[in-house]
């Protein structure tokens, strides 16, 4: 089976600067060096031409990379800031909500290598990294299988570990409040929150910062040791989402 690719939304701005240290190809042309795209009347303006979308693909997929400048990380958290980030894979630009959205198209296992290096320390123990790899892979593959609908879950005020999760009506407005005092409204994020890509790169989904964060041999070993493994229940991939403790 061919390894799937995931479309990861990285940033959305009216102006995006990026750099190709290596040669990439777009519309049968080769490009390199510093680049700029601008939102212009519903189109993407690049090198004095307007496009509905652009797809830059690496000539050497395993080694080539690109850099996005001023990517906002930790959105709405106390550590929110901008930084330059580097990525393997392809770079796609689309128009979305009067802005340009930059999307990284990357193999699932390469994506996971970055996730477990970005979500936690790349120097953690091998067994912890392996467990995280399986959990993150399970969550991702489950989201890729979702076809429609946003899930919202109510949790009873009993012990959280033993609480029964109840699926609410999918038509419930995601910003509404549940009036019943016996329940607490919990928002579950799904890939359907993103229309034009599979997952985003920030804490809304899983923290993904490309090859910006240094990986380690231990991370590579954890990915290889668990390659393709996911948690299942009754032949279905588990939605193995996890919470943050900040």
Identify the residue ranges that each predicted region occupies.
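Conserved, single-site charged/polar hotspot
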Residues: 1-246
